[in-house]
Amino acid sequence: MNLIAVLEQEEIKRLTGDKTMPEFAPGDTVVVSVNVVEGTRKRVQAYEGVVIAKRNRGLNSSFIVRKISSGEAVERTFQLYSPQIAGIEVKRRGDVRRAKLYYLRSRSGKSARIKEKLVTKQAKSA
């Protein structure tokens, strides 16, 4: 492993600290808790939507969340290891066959729905 990769891994460990990042994929509905600073006040704002893209690039990993807010579609890009992210919670798993769901931008209503992935129980091997 080269020196830059080692430094990136150390920085990821330092930034995550005690936070645990859940595994999520495009199509999943997530709630991203974002630290917002307004003047001197600091609060946590929840941003819920569908992950339409995920970019795995080590320390530079990011993902795009799309939500419909009062009839308007809003997309926001988050850096995965950003200190502004307080936490990520997966609400539901989506069953999709694409890595990038950019086609959802041209759809609205029922055609923009994503099928839910049903979780199967693991068989016990004893």
Swiss-Prot record:
Entry keyword annotation includes Ribosomal protein: yes
GO cellular component, one term: cytosolic large ribosomal subunit
InterPro entries referenced in this protein's UniProt entry, alphabetically: Ribosomal_bL19 (IPR001857), Ribosomal_bL19_CS (IPR018257), Ribosomal_bL19_sf (IPR038657), Translation_prot_SH3-like_sf (IPR008991)
Molecular function terms from GO: structural constituent of ribosome
Name of the gene encoding the protein in the UniProt record: rplS
Extent of the signal sequence: none
Keywords, in A-Z order: Ribonucleoprotein, Ribosomal protein
GO BP annotation list: translation
Protein name: Large ribosomal subunit protein bL19
